[in-house]
């Protein structure tokens, strides 16, 4: 199951955006990341499209609202950004956030950019893909 949802793929046509527009915005806002040369879509996830951005050998993550008409409080990437940013100076491990854009004219919807953190995503809620000892350690840390 994990291979079906893990990794990246080419960006789906209905979720694509203009990379030149994003780079122009990054430069204009003086966001502390390099120009983006490659964009892939993460395979997993349920609601907000998530992309792997690469620029100058560095990886970043862009999360955005999906295109189309949405309920006002749905897909609140601004809330995600604010929560992750608020956790920066706490013991909770979180990626560094770089920028929140609430102007849908840039790439079609609101979005934010954060640090890419390599790790393991357990798609199965009981983490059946790991051995019993490791699973116990994971569950102990969650409690």
Per-range role (PLM):
Residues 2-33:
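Juxta-kinase regulatory segment immediately upstream of eukaryotic protein kinase catalytic domains
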Residues 36-143:
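ATP-binding pocket architecture of kinase catalytic cores
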């Amino acid at each position: 199951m994990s291979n079906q949802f893990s990794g990246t793929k080419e960006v789906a046509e209905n979720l694509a955006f203009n990379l030149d527009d994003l780079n122009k915005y990054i430069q204009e806002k003086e966001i502390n990341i390099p120009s983006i040369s490659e964009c892939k879509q993460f395979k997993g996830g349920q609601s907000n499209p998530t992309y792997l951005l690469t620029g100058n050998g560095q990886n970043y993550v862009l999360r955005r609202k999906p295109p189309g008409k949405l309920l006002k409080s749905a897909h609140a990437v601004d809330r995600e950004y604010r929560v992750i940013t608020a956790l920066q100076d706490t013991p909770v491990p979180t990626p560094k956030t770089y920028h929140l854009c609430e102007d849908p004219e840039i790439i079609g919807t609101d979005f934010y950019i954060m640090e890419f953190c390599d790790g393991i995503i357990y798609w199965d809620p009981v983490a059946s893909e790991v051995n019993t000892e490791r699973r116990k350690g994971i569950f102990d840390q969650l409690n």
